[in-house]
Amino acid sequence: NQIRVLLNNGFDIGIHTKSHPFCNKLEFDVLNEEIIASSRRLGKKFNRKVNFASYPFGARPSFNLEKKLITKSQIQVLLGINSKITNEREPFKWERDKQDSSYNSVNWLRFNCLPYLKYLL
């Protein structure tokens, strides 16, 4: 019931996977099943499209597998980290993702600069 209250108040929900594996060690078909099965189950329960997924342990697969997963599923955002979680880890470090070669300067300006310019204008 708490999740329904959040959804009714404009919050969104995401998934974590079906069986909590280390996703950086999975082949695409298994990774896809982990994400899709969890997404379908949650989406069906709350009659809502699930757009977000977070990797267990923060363990991300390769960039190409992530790109393929986003292309073939309804997931739009995949959250994870590329390094181990330890007490020495900087909690506010923002990890950068690799960019696809098709991500040109126009797209870079559109997605990285324009959102900030709107606040300045």
What spans do the regions from the language model cover?
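Acidic (Asp/Glu)-rich catalytic clusters
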Residues: 1-14, 44-46, 88
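Histidine-centered divalent metal-coordination motifs
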Residues: 16, 20
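C-terminal active-site subregion of NodB/CE4 polysaccharide deacetylases
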Residues: 25-52, 57-121
